[in-house]
């Protein structure tokens, strides 16, 4: 039980996929302008990442490895992610049309979010079992959502601040992301996996 908790904390804080592994930067920069869309994107990504981790583990364990076709891993994981994203898009469209409109193009772009594919591939590479795969996927998603929500809240405050002209827009966003990454480096050594 303790190692599962350490895996979760390590994935959320110490080995954050956005700030440490630099995966998922496109939605991190693209959806973080408004807090509402960041929260929605975080929830959708959490659902997709967790479900994609489970599905990719099952496909790897029960189809690819027994048949000796591990070379199809990346292609099959991309297909699984696309199916999970389509399912998520249908669920969001039915349950919350407003959120569906707010997320716009970013919801289908979860398919190309490298963090989702990265989590699926790292689950296999690190030989996680079924429970560890779920925790790893959920932890990566929570870490992504945490960073996305914090960053969007900071960007909203920065938008209201008097920023010098050369730093407006993407420049101040990159500086802010760098400072967040430095802050998360403070968690290094908290959990050794």
Curated annotation (Swiss-Prot):
GO BP terms in the entry: electron transport chain
Principal location class: membrane
Bilayer-crossing regions: 5-25, 39-59, 63-83, 102-122, 134-154, 171-191
InterPro entries, per the entry: Ion_transpt_RnfA/RsxA (IPR011293), NqrDE/RnfAE (IPR003667), NqrDE/RnfAE_oxidrdctase (IPR050133)
Keyword line: Cell inner membrane, Cell membrane, Electron transport, Membrane, Translocase, Transmembrane, Transmembrane helix, Transport
Tagged with keyword Transmembrane helix: yes
GO terms for cellular component: plasma membrane
Pfam name, any one: Rnf-Nqr
Enzyme class, UniProt record, top EC level: translocase
Compartments, as annotated in UniProt: Cell inner membrane
Membrane topology type: Multi-pass membrane protein
Known EC number: 7.-.-.-
Disulfide bonds: none
PANTHER family assigned: INTEGRAL MEMBRANE PROTEIN OF SOXR-REDUCING COMPLEX, ION-TRANSLOCATING OXIDOREDUCTASE COMPLEX SUBUNIT A
Subunit comment: The complex is composed of six subunits: RnfA, RnfB, RnfC, RnfD, RnfE and RnfG.
Protein role: Part of a membrane-bound complex that couples electron transfer with translocation of ions across the membrane.
Family of this protein: Belongs to the NqrDE/RnfAE family.
Protein name as catalogued: Ion-translocating oxidoreductase complex subunit A
């Amino acid at each position: 039980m303790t190692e599962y908790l350490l895996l979760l904390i390590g994935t959320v804080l110490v080995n954050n996929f956005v700030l440490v592994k630099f995966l998922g930067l496109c939605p991190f920069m693209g959806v973080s302008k408004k807090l509402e869309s960041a929260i929605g994107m975080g929830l959708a990504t959490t659902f997709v990442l967790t479900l994609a981790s489970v599905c990719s583990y099952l496909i790897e364990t029960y189809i690819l490895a027994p048949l000796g076709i591990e070379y199809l891993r990346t292609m099959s994981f991309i297909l699984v992610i696309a199916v999970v994203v389509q399912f998520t898009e249908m669920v969001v469209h039915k349950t919350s049309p407003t959120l569906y409109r707010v997320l716009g193009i970013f919801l289908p772009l979860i398919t190309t979010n490298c963090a989702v594919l990265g989590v699926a591939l790292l689950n296999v590479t690190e030989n996680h079992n079924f429970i560890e795969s779920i925790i790893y996927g959920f932890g990566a998603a929570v870490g992504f959502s945490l960073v996305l929500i914090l960053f969007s809240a900071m960007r909203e405050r920065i938008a209201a601040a008097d920023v010098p002209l050369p730093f407006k827009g993407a420049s101040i966003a990159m500086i802010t992301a760098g400072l967040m990454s430095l802050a998360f480096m403070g968690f290094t050594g908290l959990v050794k996996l």
